[in-house]
């Protein structure tokens, strides 16, 4: 479940830290969250797709590590990102 170029560009524009930013932790978390959402929808209808489930768990772990990094570096940016993406209640 990959993202097309237009979706990626939109995510980059909404979460970038500076104008030429394409790979900051915030952008990576936003892209992972979108991919996780798409893959979760896929797994709702394909419950026996175990390889996709494994990939989903890897993406969730990576997002968790990136969020932990952001939280350690700047708690304010972490709180804004979580609110903007809509994760963690």
Swiss-Prot record:
Q: Mind listing the UniProt keywords for this protein, alphabetically?
A: Ribonucleoprotein, Ribosomal protein, RNA-binding, rRNA-binding
What PROSITE patterns does the annotation carry?
Answer: RIBOSOMAL_S15
Q: Which domain of life is it from?
A: Bacteria
One GO CC annotation, please?
Answer: cytosolic small ribosomal subunit
| SMART domains, per database record | Ribosomal_S15
Q: Which GO terms describe its biological process?
A: translation
- On whether Lipid biosynthesis is a keyword of this UniProt record, the answer is no
Example GO molecular function term? rRNA binding
* Pfam families assigned: Ribosomal_S15
Tell me the function of this protein: One of the primary rRNA binding proteins, it binds directly to 16S rRNA where it helps nucleate assembly of the platform of the 30S subunit by binding and bridging several RNA helices of the 16S rRNA. Forms an intersubunit bridge (bridge B4) with the 23S rRNA of the 50S subunit in the ribosome.
Q: Which PANTHER family match?
A: RIBOSOMAL PROTEIN S15, BACTERIAL AND ORGANELLAR (PTHR23321), SMALL RIBOSOMAL SUBUNIT PROTEIN US15M (PTHR23321:SF26)
What NCBIfam families has UniProt attached to this entry? Answer: S15_bact
UniProt family annotation:
Belongs to the universal ribosomal protein uS15 family.
Record's subunit section:
Part of the 30S ribosomal subunit. Forms a bridge to the 50S subunit in the 70S ribosome, contacting the 23S rRNA.
What is the protein's name according to its record?
Answer: Small ribosomal subunit protein uS15
What lineage is on file? Bacteria, Bacillati, Cyanobacteriota, Cyanophyceae, Synechococcales
